[in-house]
Amino acid sequence: RSSAASDVYKRQAKGYVVDMAADALEQMGIENYIVDIGGEVRCRGQRAKGGPWRVGVETPFDGNQSPGAYVQQVISLSDCAFATSGNYRRYYIDDEGRKVAHTIDPRTGRSAVSDLLSATVVAPTCAEADAFGTMFMALGKDKAIEKARILEKQGILVYFITSGADGAFEVYYSEALASTLKRKEGFHAI
């Protein structure tokens, strides 16, 4: 198995393991929990202090090797799963000067070149959030936004970060997340 294919498998497996752990907690009758394995998250109920769980979306800058140290946004969640795919930690620069991420584009079988910096997905299960995040990264911004509009009707919500023309971050998010976000200039509901 190639290292790229192995990486895709490992990332998808992580979401599945989060779901298995969450299911085990529910079978034990635990109603309030958060399971987090390397940023793949599933939560139910509320925090001990009350209110929804709060999960950070990292700032996707090159070389950000410190998970959780640079939070761009906090999203409040309950009874769902959350996963982020991005191109800011594991990538290389190709011969044409393009950033090539570790995400494999299933249409080509090659590493994806994406104009998305990160794709955060909220879904019923972590395996779904993981898979959709990878898909959105492979699709790129315009096609990902188009697909996200369709998937929002099925309860799949997104928070995409791109780099604008001036280099500042631009965010595209599902309208259903609006109430949980601290919106700034450069934020766009899809």
What role is predicted for each listed range?
Residues D36-I37, V57-T59, S85-G86, P124, ...:
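Active-site-proximal beta-strand/loop segments in catalytic clefts of secreted hydrolases
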Residues I37-G39, R98-I161:
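Proteins synthesized as precursors that undergo proteolytic processing into mature forms
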Residues L157-I190:
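Low-complexity, Gly/Ser/Thr/Pro-rich intrinsically disordered linker/tail segments
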Residues R44-K49, Y173-S174:
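Short acidic, glycine/serine/threonine-rich loops at helix termini
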Residues S3, D95-E96, P106-T108, A165:
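Short, ordered coil/turn segments that flank beta-strands lining enzyme active or ligand-binding pockets
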Residues R47-G97, D105:
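Single conserved position on a long alpha-helix in the C-terminal lobe of the eukaryotic protein kinase
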Residues R11-C43, G140:
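Cysteine-centered nucleophilic/redox motifs
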Residues R1-Y9:
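Single conserved hydrophobic/aromatic residue that forms the stacking wall/gate
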